[in-house]
Amino acid sequence: MSSFFETVRKRFDKAEKRLDQFNAGPALDILGRVERLGYDVASVSGLPETRLNELLLFERATGDSVTAMALALDPDSIGCAMLGRAENVEAGNRVRGTSTVASVPVGEALLGRTVDSLGNPLDGGSKLEASPREPVDKPAPGIIERDFVNEPLYTGLAVIDAMLPLGRGQRELIIGDRETGKTAIAVDTMVNQRDSGVICVYCAVGQKLSSVTEVIDAVRRYGAPERCIFVIAAADDPPGLQWLAPYAACTMAEYFSERGKDALLVIDDLTQHAVIYRQLSLLLRNPPGREAYPGDIFYIHSRLLERAAKLGRERGGGSLTALPIAATEEGNLSGYIPTNLISITDGQIVLEPRLFHEGQKPAVNVGKSVSRVGGKSQVTAMRQAAETLRLEYAQFLELEIFTRFGGMVDERTKRIIEHGRRIRAILTQPQFAPLPMPHQVALLLALNEGMLDRLPLEKVPQLRDSLRRWFSDHGSAVFERVAVTGEVDEASRKSLRENVAKLVFELSGSATPSLAPS
């Protein structure tokens, strides 16, 4: 009964606010004028009350209108970015203010949909007119509203989950040269959320439609598209739509995190977003700074990524994890935009072309990569299994260099190198084949106990597949225990040790003992 009265009270309060805003006098419509138009930006005069990010309607010669957004406010003019095609819009045409800032539809109706930066459907589905709308540019949660990042977000990639763990509410930059697998890591992370309940939002900024289509098809084939939203601003869209896309996608993801759910936001990519903003700023005649970027380029990315957070209990306890992607040139991490993004985020996953061309995929340079806050969210089982992994792998990479020159090495060095090669084999995974956390723990425990050192190197991928089948057919109880508790008790450790040893024995070419269910 109390909930009924609470609902009635809220509706009366809403009606009272509407009455307070009602004006029975004559409507006053203030019109502006297009002074200059070109390259999808315009200068407008006669609208002194316009707010930043307000939507404006430009009248066309054909009688309809096109939407633009106010990006620069001067005493005598307004700089606008067109959010639609500017055909038939000419200097002298009338401009009408809307008194509303840019907003997008949010809510459950967006799940499974492909939309543009304004929430208009791109998949041929119905319009989202009944969905609630929220502004694209919202303030980030304050310090008091946040909580510690203490829950893991699994990517399904052993190299990340073991050595660069992510937490829910973290911001982790994926950075590297072109064609090194940056988007592949993000897509694999989205695919791995198919059983986790995490809402995924993928935002493409200035990408080719063919590349975007591949991402959407991959998620629909391998992931859970019914819990994904795709926000697309392709390379041939107006620059205003491309600039707006990450903020719109963040608003859509925030809707779920503010209601106690966990959301994942992938932005592909922020380097292109910075280029678009530089283009708009120069066309709007804003003063350029370093590398011709405007002076507030750091701010536009920080105010976006600061919206990703783990919220406290008072705010519902939800989280928004951000995986922004950035491109480098010739592996240069000291460029203007890369250094900005590295300083804003909570860590970076650095990809190298050399590793990619050598067949190590994901091509993660572990030495240059770091996760600053995710380690606190790592479960006990994974933390114990990967405790010495990074050190052993770094030692192997250092020693491997000497073997390339044909130098003689002692037996201890040979063992370290052979062990390191098996670490690398475990960390190399095919795309769209994420490994659950218990599966990774089992492989790492076998590695730590030296079982894989007795297995031929080329058989390591087969062991991974055999272990997946064993978990499915016989080891479901062990799998559930490790997944739920985050720990490997003595019974689970014994079962994993015995059955992995049997699989290694089988793959080594000997007779196969039968696998006992656990």
Outline where the language-model segments fall.
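P-loop NTPase nucleotide-binding/switch module
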Residues: 93-95, 102, 109, 122-170, ...
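Conserved helix-turn-beta segment of the N-terminal RecA-like "Helicase ATP-binding" lobe
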Residues: 214-226
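N-terminal accessory targeting/assembly segments
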Residues: 1-113, 118-122
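Conserved P-loop NTPase nucleotide-binding/switch module
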Residues: 178-199, 204-205, 209-211, 222-223, ...
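Active-site phosphate-binding and catalytic loops of NTP-dependent enzymes
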Residues: 20-24, 64-67, 102-106, 120-127, ...
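Conserved catalytic/coupling modules of large nucleotide/cofactor-utilizing molecular machines
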Residues: 2, 272, 282-518
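Phosphate-interacting basic helix/loop segments used at nucleotide- and nucleic-acid interfaces
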Residues: 14-25, 155-160, 249, 304
